[in-house]
Amino acid sequence: MVWLLAILAYLLGSLSFAVLLSRWFGTQDPRASGSGNPGATNMLRVAGKKLAILTLLGDVGKGLLPVLVARWLGLGVMEEAWVGIAAVIGHLYPLYFNFRGGKGVATAAGMLLGLYPPAVLLAAAAWLLTFKLSRTSSLASLVATPLTLPLLAWQQPGALLPMTVLTGLIVWRHRANLRDLFAGRERHF
């Protein structure tokens, strides 16, 4: 059951809302504009607030839905988390878009919302504070994501290993941003 859900979650995660919305609304392909990342932040840059919000909602939803389905089917929190990670991996390496995906932060937030909502509140507060101080989305994501781990270790220990793996995936997908941050070249808003 877990494997079937994980495959379905991966396929759902492979839907790139940024790319689909850019096609539907006739705007620039986010993979060829701005930062080149098909995510909500780049959609804000290349297509405006409306499409950025729709992208964010779609990306959060595709992380949330598989976790809720796994819970509805009676799986444990660890299995729910692994199913959610499959959706994030779909976002990172989408089958339908030549495995060229986004950074996974919004999809991970949706997954986390399904697993333990207070962790999303902590991550959102950390993201907003870091972004307010730095005006840098990638830095905010890199600060917010690992901050959820101690809370999960305390409140949802079954989700800790999958979330640690997820944190590693998100840091890995931000490796170019890390290089740019250290070199002083990272984009700011």
Curated annotation (Swiss-Prot):
Functional description taken from the UniProt entry: Catalyzes the transfer of an acyl group from acyl-phosphate (acyl-PO(4)) to glycerol-3-phosphate (G3P) to form lysophosphatidic acid (LPA). This enzyme utilizes acyl-phosphate as fatty acyl donor, but not acyl-CoA or acyl-ACP.
Q: List the InterPro entries hit by this protein, alphabetically.
A: G3P_acylTferase_PlsY (IPR003811)
Q: Does the keyword Hydrolase apply?
A: no
Q: Where is the signal peptide?
A: none
UniProt subunit comment: Probably interacts with PlsX.
Keywords assigned? Cell inner membrane, Cell membrane, Lipid biosynthesis, Lipid metabolism, Membrane, Phospholipid biosynthesis, Phospholipid metabolism, Transferase, Transmembrane, Transmembrane helix
Subcellular location as annotated: Cell inner membrane
Catalysed reaction per UniProt? Answer: an acyl phosphate + sn-glycerol 3-phosphate = a 1-acyl-sn-glycero-3-phosphate + phosphate
| A single MF term (Gene Ontology) | acyl-phosphate glycerol-3-phosphate acyltransferase activity
- Top-level taxon of the source organism: Bacteria
Q: What is its main location?
A: membrane
Q: Which GO terms describe its biological process?
A: phospholipid biosynthetic process
**Keyword Transmembrane set for record:** yes
Residues passing through the membrane, by range: 1-21, 50-70, 72-92, 111-131, 151-171
Give the enzyme's EC designation.
2.3.1.275
Q: What is this protein called?
A: Glycerol-3-phosphate acyltransferase
- What pathway or pathways are given for this protein in its record? Lipid metabolism; phospholipid metabolism
The kind of enzyme this is, by top-level EC class, is transferase
Instruction: Please report the record's description of how this protein sits within the membrane.
Output: Multi-pass membrane protein
Annotated Pfam families: G3P_acyltransf
Q: Which organism is this protein's natural source?
A: Pseudomonas aeruginosa (strain ATCC 15692 / DSM 22644 / CIP 104116 / JCM 14847 / LMG 12228 / 1C / PRS 101 / PAO1)
One GO cellular component assignment for this chain's record is: plasma membrane
Q: Cite the NCBIfam families for this sequence.
A: glycerol-3-phosphate 1-O-acyltransferase PlsY
Family statement: Belongs to the PlsY family.
